[in-house]
Amino acid sequence: MSGIPNTRMRRALGCAAVMLFAAVAGGCASLQSWIPSIPPPSFDWLTSMFGGGKKIAPLPDFPITANAEIAWQVNIGKSAPGLAPAVTPNAIYAANSSGTIYRIDPANGAVVWRTEAGRKLAAGVGADATLVVVGTDKGDVLAFDADGKARWQVKVTSEVLGPPRVAEGIVVVFTGDGRIHGLTAADGQTKWVYQRTNPPLTIRNYAGGTSSRGGLFAGTAGGKLLAIDLATGNVGWEGNVATPKGATELERIADVTSLPIVEERQVCAVAFQGRIACFDLVRGELLWTRDVSSLSGISIDNRFLFVADDAGAVHALDKVTGASAWKQDGLMARKAAGAQIAGDYLLVLDPQGYLYLLDRSDGKLVGRAATDGTPSTAQAAQSGANAVWQTQGGIVYAVTGR
């Protein structure tokens, strides 16, 4: 079990019903927060989110030598986990929990249009150049065109989890019953459905999937990475990111809960209580692994793969070999998560809405800025030189480092 002491796991048993959901015994309510923002299961940290328990440490002191520049910000209304901006070359789409969908100009943050879904939303946004897709906890999938006009709506088998993926004429929808649905982008009709049996206990997964070269790459409960043909739903290959270990179901959780990253001819993913693994994009051959556990996802530049681990330490690994380039542990007490490229720097976030800039070459802390004081709904996405994310308070930020 990677990086999580047994004592911490025993403490986590008391909050498992809050943080996790069981596929048996009637199921437990899931934690209404951004799951990828949390460190390894810790009762103290979880209760602090609701005003009790121990608070995270004071802000670290370091010389500010870079400017975390907020290029623009848009208030769209309170947003739940599972809602995250969709970045396309000419537009950013975002939605709030009450059902309002926005198209935002990525150059300046101007709202191009807004439209109403007519119901509360739990998942989205997925988009390409012509289609914008959102989902509800009732299993409704709603599609709009790039001008905000309703195109179609269909119902799938269970609640929609995380942003749909729109690519190659297919809308991919992930549902709470473990299914992956391939819908035709033209009318929403089901083209294929993939299903696998989930372990008894899993982390609620809001990540969705990544598409490239006609394939969908998606992580699963139990630590697998799937390569699925978008046209047919057939599995091309299955890679092992992590292997469940331990005596209890809680200890055996080894889920891929963040977006895989496709870079050149490899695809990489990270698992909670597991490791980072990179595979050949076409053949699925394992290229390298590194024992780093994370819920909050990875990003890649021309040299390194970046990840914030479950304890809040930030790592840079050689993207070809997995060798460690540097490790920054100065934000562990702040529960840093969600590493993403922002201009010349690496950006990470903490649960109190602070963002930090790190020098990508050596991991040195160089900048900091405050946002609205609420956690992110998901890992930041990249839009040109900006990192773009949405907070639970309802602000969409575009930030770069200078």
Regions inferred by a protein language model and the residue ranges of each:
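Bacterial N-terminal signal peptides that target proteins for export
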Residues: G3-A16
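C-terminal motif of bacterial Sec signal peptides marking the signal peptidase cleavage site
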Residues: V24-G27
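Extracytoplasmic beta-rich repeat domains
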Residues: L31-F43, G53-K54, I64-A86, V112-D128, ...
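Conserved beta-propeller blade signature
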Residues: A91-Y93, V132-V134, V171-V173, H181, ...
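Structural signature of WD-repeat beta-propellers
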Residues: N96-S97, T136, T175-G176, T220-A221, ...
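Short loop/turn segments that connect beta-strands within beta-propeller blades
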Residues: D105-N108, D145-K149, T184-G188, L230-G233, ...
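Blade-level signature of beta-propeller repeat domains, shared across WD40, Kelch, NHL, RCC1
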Residues: L365, T371-R402
